[in-house]
Amino acid sequence: MAYLKSIEINQFRGIQELSISGFSDINLIVGDNNSGKTTFLEAIQLLFAKPQLSSIKSITNQRTAIHSNNSFYTSFIKMFNVEQDKEDLDLEISAKCNDGMRRVELIGVEKAVAGEDAIQLSKMSNRQKEQYKGSSGFIPETAKLFEGKIVTQCGKKTTEKKISCTSLDNGIPGPIVKKEVFYISSFGHLRYDLLQNIVDNPEYKNLAISILKQFDDSIADICYTKADDGTYLESIITKNGVNMPFSVYGDGIKKILYILNKLFDATDSILMIDEIETGLHKKYYSTLFPVVFALAKKLNVQLFIATHSMEAIEAILEYGNYENKVKDHDSIKVITLKKVNPEIDHGSNIVARNVTGKYVYDNRKVFDFEVRL
């Protein structure tokens, strides 16, 4: 089982010298806007990614998934220090896990090259290069080239691999590999398969339907149905036998199914959920969250949940049942990220406060503790 105990982000995107330890089963990542919550979740993914550009692309694309035409190279370069103005680039993340140390480091140089040279050095196939020359209308006078290496450590095994890409690259070839950890973006429920792991598992399917009925009691079944053009649609069957495509339902039902689907994927691993409140009305938090946490425990899934919603935080803390039990282990940790001045804070530009769910619950109750700042 993949389980994160601590992490050090020496350099990644806008985060410098951030160290957090003492993670638990359910970890809430909170903080002000632009405090690094999504970057933190990306850092965890990068630690477990395969040392290849195609795996890195799958992480960088998460921010721009709705806008598929965004440049891979631009997203890739922004993984390094966003304020770094020198040619030499580097990022480094390390962590202690239940299976030993993990570490990833990207080191390289960005430089300008002639447009013709960039085409030849790009990841495009020979056919794509010819198509680019013929269809683009013009070849840029200069382009950017990154050359470097990825160094990864998993336990006692260290791997080093040379990489390169140009600002003309968009499609990055590489084998499709099973991910070790899993991520739910704030808008993932709008575009990904929602039933993949549910419809073929009767027990899991019945659980999903029972949850959906609390949103809409007319729901009787969920399945794939074949349309007239031969495609398969994700559909809901009502108790009156009416076949309704998911497209006519709101985001809440899609978000629930997406979370349940990804939980199954993340069995014996880590699941990160960005902005868990997106698409969900707050009145359903108390119904959904206990089911998600109970399933995560059953499936051995460690959760990292980013949110800026105080209502979501309070609903998650209710799961701790702090009024009725006393025990040493608290399954909930609340990690608050906050921007600071690196010149004052020994080079760190973001610091973390890590406290137990019970601490936040007690202080919210007595002092109206603001955990997000």
Where do the language-model regions lie?
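Switch/communication elements of ASCE P-loop NTPase nucleotide-binding domains
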Residues: 1-58, 243-373
